[in-house]
Amino acid sequence: MIKLTQKWWGVVAVALLCFAPSAFANSNLTMTGAGNNVMDGVYVGPYYATVNGVANSPVICDDFADESYIGSSWNITTNNFSTLGSALWGNQTQNYEAAAWLTLQMLSLNGNSSNATQVGYLSFAIWSLFDKSALNGLNSTQLAGVDSWLSKVPSNLTPGEFANFVILTPQGCKNGPGSCPGQEFLMMVPEGGAAALYLLFAGLSCFGAMLLRRRRQAPSATSSMA
């Protein structure tokens, strides 16, 4: 049974999410890490960033068209499912819902190194929702893995299922995707009252250049990050 206070905190959290874009209009993101999982020369899985002063925040990239580097910073607008018109890929509600659902699967698997391949497939599945060219370098086995995850995305998703997701959209994109100072990311915030507090206080509030997306050499592999 859900306590009444929990229910009201949930309402407050959703309300704050609705106002997040204006409250976070001048927010900042700094890339701080990308893990060590590489597929097809690209870093996959959650990356880590300082977002509005909150360090070590897991963020999931949905943007294969742009690049990010460890230590780089850029201004962001924080969107949600009520403000997709301001997000990088616009009003692609179904694709953003699918990306959020795939993100949940990724985060549930990421803690176990034996799931590294599946986490890689999930990253490419998310990228391919918005940019099919992300799949160009994959082999047949990898493509099958990506397709398998895409086929599992439920067809009846709704924005309300992802009220604890925010979309960190880079500012300063001169000509849409591919012209941004950094990549767009999805990020989960704590549910219930914690989400409300996170959004409230986050709104108040270098490392060597490592390429995050382009296919280049990563340590001990022909690799890169996305």
Where are the regions that the model predicts?
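Hydrophobic alpha-helical segments, especially transmembrane helices
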Residues: 7-8, 199, 214-216
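A short, hydrophobic C-terminal helix/tail in secreted or cell-surface proteins
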Residues: 191-212
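Sec/Tat signal peptide C-region and signal peptidase I cleavage site
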Residues: 21-25
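Bacterial N-terminal signal peptides that target proteins for export
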Residues: 2-10
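Short, surface-exposed polybasic-aromatic patches that bind anionic ligands, especially phosphate groups
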Residues: 26-188
